[in-house]
């Protein structure tokens, strides 16, 4: 696939740029921040991800490979397509987006266009370990509890907010470090039921 494009900038629009490389004009979708760094007539190089669908082949361009890698990671979440992933990177820079996902910050994640509460919870739950998390949300995980993730995931699946599920699971595991998945889930449900 096409990993990068370098050449003269022929045209810049609100959501894409056309870069001529070896006599071919490539339309590359990009965030407004990336597009703002480009100038018509100058040479540019964008790191790209090529998304092939049944009815289209689309290039997405990024200033660096970290942004491209985060874009591809976002695509791994059910319900997140290229336009939402690009919208997330348009809304937040890479470190800020990683922090929001790592912290399970649903308020920040629901500000992304076309991302509702359920999708934000799924983003946080699915990608927390892949994009990194803050020290406050990773206390139990850092302690080596392999059951934390499955318990939190089960609680979210039952309709609890990610933050609630994490707090309850962390309290249960702090009180009983030897808990099994099922005993931790029962204790967390009991704790959440009392609130």
From Swiss-Prot:
Renumbered residue ranges of the record's region Domain I: 1-63
Name of this chain's protein: Holliday junction branch migration complex subunit RuvA
Family: Belongs to the RuvA family.
Localisation per UniProt entry: Cytoplasm
Gene that produces this protein: ruvA
Keyword Phosphoprotein among UniProt keywords: no
Region of interest: Domain II: 64-138
Domain notes from UniProt: Has three domains with a flexible linker between the domains II and III and assumes an 'L' shape. Domain III is highly mobile and contacts RuvB.
Region (Flexible linker): 138-142
MF-aspect GO terms: ATP binding; four-way junction DNA binding; four-way junction helicase activity
Lineage of the species this protein comes from: Bacteria, Bacillati, Actinomycetota, Actinomycetes, Mycobacteriales
Species for this entry: Mycolicibacterium gilvum (strain PYR-GCK)
């Amino acid at each position: 696939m096409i990993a990068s494009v370098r050449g003269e900038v022929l045209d810049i629009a609100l959501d894409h740029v056309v870069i001529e490389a070896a006599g071919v004009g490539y339309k590359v979708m990009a965030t407004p921040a990336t597009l703002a760094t480009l100038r018509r007539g100058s040479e540019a190089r964008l790191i790209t991800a090529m998304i092939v669908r049944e009815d289209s082949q689309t290039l997405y361009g990024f200033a660096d490979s970290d942004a491209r890698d985060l874009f591809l990671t976002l695509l791994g979440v059910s319900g997140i397509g290229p336009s939402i992933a690009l919208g997330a990177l348009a809304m937040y820079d890479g470190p800020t987006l990683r922090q929001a996902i790592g912290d399970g910050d649903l308020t920040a994640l629901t500000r992304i266009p076309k991302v509702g509460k359920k999708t934000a919870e799924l983003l946080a739950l699915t990608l927390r370990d892949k994009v990194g998390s803050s020290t406050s949300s990773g206390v139990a995980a850092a302690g080596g509890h392999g059951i934390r993730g499955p318990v939190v995931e089960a609680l979210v699946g039952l309709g609890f907010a990610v933050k609630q599920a994490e707090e309850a699971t962390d309290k249960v595991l702090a009180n009983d470090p030897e808990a099994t998945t099922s005993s931790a889930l029962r204790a967390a449900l009991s704790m959440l039921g009392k609130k």
